[in-house]
């Protein structure tokens, strides 16, 4: 069975059984009807996914791999902050009349900085170091820029990726690992979505840097289940689990900026039914 399913189920059970409630507290999120959106939360959740063993898409319900990858490429490849560059409507709630989400997400990755090697943005710096200085302990991105928070329509949830390269004994190729730091996560709507996005990113970067994929470590400061999601989560984690799917990525792509959503697919992906009409707190 899928290791990602086990990780997800264990996390949800831990939150439901051992988490703390925000009910009655002053909280920012609210439901469409204006009422406060309370959560059951756990602090400091850490999940480890060995991408060399399986692709971490849960099978309890389907994760739309092309849609979540398109969003990741919107941020990491196009470095865009405009929803008109994205087919999905997920971000519409935070866009202004021009489609901008402000100086958030892709905008920050596209800002060029002066380095000894020249002007580069954060993504290009990561790729440069993975190719030229792979054992550096300084290969990371950070989009939680305090100076620009007042110009962001929403603060970044997943805000930092730290890459770390290892050499396995007897292997002629290096292994790419990463830590994804996330300040907050709506577990039902976003957990596996984010995990799959950054797993795909690691596969893409490993391919263009001639490395193997290793571990993705997901650190969530506030992992929460909303009050109106509790029954949905309880039903979801009781479902039948299936073997993990296999990720296919076009082996011909050698430049990160050449990838499109048509260059990947999940094979043998058997899942439970989708959960429809999930209420979303904003």
Please tell me what each predicted stretch does:
Residues 1-282:
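Terminal, non-catalytic protein-protein interaction segments that mediate quaternary/complex assembly
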């Amino acid at each position: 069975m899928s290791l990602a399913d086990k990780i997800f189920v264990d996390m949800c059970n831990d939150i439901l059984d051992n988490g703390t409630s925000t009910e009655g507290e002053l909280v920012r999120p609210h439901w469409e009807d204006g009422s406060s959106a309370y959560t059951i939360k756990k602090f400091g959740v850490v999940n480890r996914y060995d991408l060399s063993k399986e692709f971490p898409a849960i099978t309890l319900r389907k994760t739309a791999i092309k849609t979540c990858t398109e969003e990741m490429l919107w941020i990491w490849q196009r470095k865009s902050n405009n929803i008109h560059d994205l087919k999905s409507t997920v971000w519409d709630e935070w866009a202004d009349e021009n489609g901008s989400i402000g100086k958030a997400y892709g905008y920050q990755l596209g800002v060029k900085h002066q380095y000894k090697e020249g002007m580069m943005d954060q993504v290009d710096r990561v790729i440069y170091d993975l190719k030229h200085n792979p054992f550096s302990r300084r290969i990371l991105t950070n989009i939680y820029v305090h100076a620009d928070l007042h110009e962001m329509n929403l603060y970044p949830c997943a805000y930092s990726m730290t890459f770390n390269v290892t050499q396995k004994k007897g292997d002629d190729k290096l292994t790419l690992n990463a830590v994804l730091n996330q300040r907050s996560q709506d577990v039902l709507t976003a957990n596996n979505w984010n995990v799959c996005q950054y797993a795909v990113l690691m596969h893409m970067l490993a391919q263009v840097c001639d490395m193997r994929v290793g571990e993705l470590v997901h650190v969530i400061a506030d992992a929460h289940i909303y009050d109106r999601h509790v029954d949905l989560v309880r039903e979801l984690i009781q479902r039948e689990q299936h073997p993990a799917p296999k990720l296919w990525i076009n082996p011909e792509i050698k430049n990160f900026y050449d990838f499109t959503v048509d260059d990947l697919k999940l094979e043998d992906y058997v899942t439970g039914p989708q959960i429809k009409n999930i209420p979303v707190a904003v």
